[in-house]
Structures are given as C-alpha cells and as structure tokens.
Amino acid sequence: MGWFDRERMDSPLRAMIERKASIAVASVAGCLLAPALLAAIWMAVKPVLQSSPWADLWQDPRTFDALTATLWTSIAASLLAWCSAAYLLRQAFIGGQSGRWLNRLPPLLATPHAAMAIAVTLWIAPTGWLFRLSSPWLTGFDSPPPWATTQDTWGLGLILVLWLKELPFLCWVAATQLHRDDVRRRWHAEYAVALTMGRSPQSAFAEVVWPQLARLMRWPLVAVLAYNMTVVDVALIIGPTAPPTLAVLAWEWLRDADLALNHQGVAAAWLLAALLIAISAVLWVTVTRVVTSFTNRQAIGLGWVTLFLVYALAWLALLVGSVSGLWPFPDVWPDHWQANDWLRVTDNLDSVWTTVGLGTLSATLTLLWLVAWLECAPQNWQAVMRPILLAPMVLPPLLWVFGLYQVALWGHWEGAWPGMVVAHAVMAMPYALLALESVYKASDRRLQSVALSLGRHPMTYLLVVKWPLLKRALWSAWAIAFAVSVAQFLPTLYIGAGRFVTVTTEAVAQSAAGQRGLMSAYALLQTVLPLLVFAIAVMMGRPRHFTKDQTWT
C-alpha cells in the first residue's frame, strides 16, 4: 500500500498518530520557550520581595521627578500616535487608498528608534538644520543659540521621536486587520449602509469602522505605551537629563556595582510595570470614545504625505551628517564633504557582521518556533500561551533583560552567541507573532481537505500549498523579527556582557560622545540593514505564477 494511498490517509490510526505528533511538536516548542520566559520573570521578581529596595527607591530624591518626566512623555507620545493613526486610517479608508499607503509602511518600520532620535537631533539641535535654514534671516542668529532643544527638561524632543516612530507601528497593526478579507468586506458593507442613511464619510468611519478597529488595536496601544514608558536608548540620545526618565534612572542603578542599587533599579522597573497596568486600564475604556469624536472632524488630506516627508528628511539628515566635513554655522550645507567616518566604520566591520548574524539567527529561530507553534499547538494551548508570548512587548524591557541575564548566568550563556540569539528572539517574538498570527489562522482550511482527499501527505500540503501561499506573511514576519533584533540595545549590553558590539550600541555610544559623523553613519546603517531585509522579504514574498502545464506534486 502506497504512502499516499487514500485509504491509509483516512485511517483513524494514521489520524491519531499525526495528531499526537503535532501535539508532541507543540509540547516541545512550548517547553523550550515557556520555562525560559517564566524563569526570567521569576528572576526579576526575587530582588523586590523584600521591602528595602522599595524604601530605597522612594527615598531617592530623583525618583519623583523622574517618574513625572516618564508619565508626561510616555502618555503624551502615546496619545499623539493614537490620534494621528486614527486620522491617517480614516483618510486612507475613506479615500479607498488604504492598500496604497499601508503597503509603503515597511521603510518607516525599518527605521530604528535610535536612528530616528539621532536624525531628529540633527534637525532640532542648536547647530541643526532647522536653525541653519532660518538663520540669520528669520532668527537673527549668527551663532548657535544657547538653548536646550535636545534633552530639554520638558522632554519635547523625546515626545517627538516616540510619536514619529510609534505612528507607523499602529498603522501597520491596523493594516493587518484591514487586509483580512472577511473583516474588509464586512466593514466596507457597514460603511456603505451608514452612507446610505445620510451619514458623512467622516461620521460613517467614526461611528461604524473605527470603534471596531480600535478594539482590535488596544493591545498594540498598550505595547506602545509600555515602550514609551521604558525606553532607554532613545531617552539617552534625546530625552531629558535633569531629571532623566525613570527607565534611564533604573538602567543607571542596574549598571552599578552596588547590589542594593541593582535591586533598587529592579524595583523602579516594577513600579513602571504597575503604572503601565493602571494607565492601560484607563486607556482601555476611554481612548476609543475620545478618538471617535476626533475622527468625526474634517481635516486636511495631507497626513500620509507629511508622514513620509518627515521620514525622508530624517534619512537625508543622517546621510548628510555621515559625510559632512567642516560645517560652520549658519551655513545650510557643509564647506566640504568627506568619507572619513565611513572609513572608520569599515575598520570596525565586526559590529556590522555581529548585527547581521544576530538578526539572521534570531529572526530564523523566531519564525521556526512560531510556525511550529501555530501549526501544531491546539487552540486552547495557544490561548493560554499568547499572553506569555506578548509579555516581552508590554512589560518593561529592563525587567526582561534583568531576568534573562540571571537565566543566562545560570545557564553559562552570558557573553555567548546562544544567549544573545535567544535574548534577541524573545524580544522579537511578540512583533513577529502579531504579523503572522492572524494571517496564518485565516488560511483556507478547504485547501487542506482537497490536498488530503487527493492522497497527499500533510507535510506535502504544508510545503507545496500552505506555506507557499503564506510566504509573503512568513517573509514579512522574518523581516520584522530581524528589524527588532537590529534595534536591540539593552539585551546586547546585558546578555552580551560587553563582548558584543552592534551598530545600535555604537550609534548610542557615538551620540553620547557627540561624534556627529560617526553617529550618523551608524544610525544610517541601523536603517539600511532592515531596509535591505524588507526588500528581500518583498522580493521573496511575491506570488508564484503558474502556466497551464504546471502541476504540483
């Protein structure tokens, strides 16, 4: 009897074996990841079970001011991104151009936060382009003004960077929902009914489409708020310094040789987590109503063009900054151009290869694990595991990094490639899951029934039918995981134990040193590497074209 014989395929024994094999694969996948994540959480909990870290935290004179700066910058940036996303999505939906704009988001997503922070610094610094373009004819300045336009006390520069970076992310999450056939048809039908009842396009979107879309985007909003409250590298580049944000303060305490200060830093991270839960609970209930009112207003239709123009200007600033030589104020362009900083980068190519290696390995590990889990795990297992998988996205990275560092010490993976790859994969997992999960689960199960009825083995169906049809989503998830890996700062510092240098750690270090050319070059590399990977993903994810004579086997 042949391997693909239909009677054998339909036998209860074979079905039972295949079901048990799938559960075994899911069990292995779950057992590989869940203990590591839970152990990391436990390692981060242990230091704060005593009262002394909390007492030290509240007695520190910088805590309250740092907490105030954190709440102001994070909430302001999150609400700005949320309202802007609502406006842009309304504009794209009403104009029938959602696919046109949303498909162009990958270059914006590929720009790391640190690179955007450096680009904004090059624009708004006292010696930046903004003052050069307006001096002296408008401002009257013949020399840079003595103003703290970056790292200002109010954190306005930090708010601007976080707003610009989180806006494309929220739009991309919405795109994953708008591109689902079932949702798109239903929402367009309901929108058309609202129009026939005399509603304006703005009112129809605000009252019919947006409330449903917003409910699906509340977890991504929590992720945005969590990142904004706990970001370290961006705050080091452009955030306030007197006081710094609480995340930066906690990072400084965790780096100290004093164990008591380490525990104080962990307590600060848990304080951020508690505040995140409280603020998220309020936003969960109120933000949809607030923005529904906002989306019901008339507005100028230049939002998407403005967003892409801002990113183009950011990339231009990085490019010019990386090749600029002597540049006296208020000249708009440098006196001469040079490539010395790029030559110094080429002398340190190890940082580039380390970044590429970590990104490739961690993205591949992430994708393999997710596919195995989504394909083999029962639905009730996935429902239980999903909050754990999304936890790295919504909990402070400082907690994860501290916990993973303790796990790495226990497993002797500190400063080693396996520990680095696993740490980067853990941080990339939730973003890749968001990109892949809905599309993977929405695949047409009738195709599997047809394949099995033709006597094909389930693995043949996966290799020849399902995965090729999903290759765009699979490559996109892999590219997103790669981009997340490139942007990692804290895991590289802690798990790498200072032995791994990436373009991100170099960009942050050079920005602290005030090296305009070097920080621009590394920030540009931060952007170019994910862009190249997204381009590869687009090319590899193109649909196949068959001729009449081609068949699948």
Which residue stretches match the model-derived regions?
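Juxtamembrane helix-boundary/capping and inter-helix hinge elements in multi-pass membrane proteins
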Residues: 95-98, 179-188, 199-202, 241-243, ...
